[in-house]
Amino acid sequence: TMINLKTIIEEDSAVKRGGYSSAIFLTYTLNLNFFEQIIAPVLESAGCSNVLILTDPDGYAEALETGKKQVAYAGMRYVCAPIPRVSSGVQHSKILFMVGKESGRLLLGSGNLTLNGYSLNLENFSHYEYNPNDPSQETLLAFSSVWKLIQKITNDNQFPETVQRQIRKIRDDAQWLNQNSIQLENFAIWSNYDQSIWTQLTKWRKDIGLAGNPLKELRIFSPYYDKDGAMLRRFAENLFPDRIEVYLSPENSTFNANSIQASWPEGIDFPSVFGIHDSREEHPNRYLHGKLIVGIEDKGAWCISGSANMTRPALDQVWQRGGNLELVTLQLSSDKKAFDYLLE
């Protein structure tokens, strides 16, 4: 679905309450002119005076290079810092995390902090609102998982004292973030900071009694694939789906049917590939940048959505050892059709 993230950030109830004091963005690429002109004023009106952007070193260098003439407020109204590389992988996760004493708003998905990522591309985001009077277990788990990741990143790397001060302010202001959250069977937030997403998926299926059960169907929406389809093959060989459907925008995808077919396992049907485009007249050339993996089981369906493409650096590797840093939401439903709307 088409949402404008700017409108979610400035959604009335929160801005009127002025309930926020801090915001953290994780992004791969960024456009600081877009941020200063469009996003920063909205954050200020919501009460966010403590704003931190954590980005990939390449994205950081590119943003400074392209924006050096217009960028006016970096280091004053907000801090932008690159997450140091620990190996060959890039910082690829994408979130907006807004918090205050009794407020929380979290967007976790596929869009970078750019005009394209927040308004123009087709992206997918999970959206969570913390309500102190009635916080759902899913919401508490989402916020605590992301907050733990942010603290790991800032604790394990050499960041300027300014950044550490910003993290301490959040810890002091939003003490509700430290509530204990319980692990859930039907919902999780996974990063590959110290364990691969593939490992977490296979462990989760085992824990809920699905290990060894063949999938009815596997549906994938991802622009990027390994050249030889290694990660797609891993899903096929380990989850035994009766059918695999791949949805992509042919002009914006690295899916190479010939090279993937060359190493495709015998006895498993090759994926059915669907070329898709935005169906609305006003977006004929829209870049489809979202990422989804939907598994249809005997009794229900699960969906993994977020920043991870169908590649080994995203799903099979750990950030500390060569993977891209990714962040995804897992949801499980007893309804096999629960996630059909995402691919319609």
Label each residue range with its predicted role.
Residues T1-E344:
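PLD/PLD-like phosphodiesterase catalytic module centered on the HKD motif
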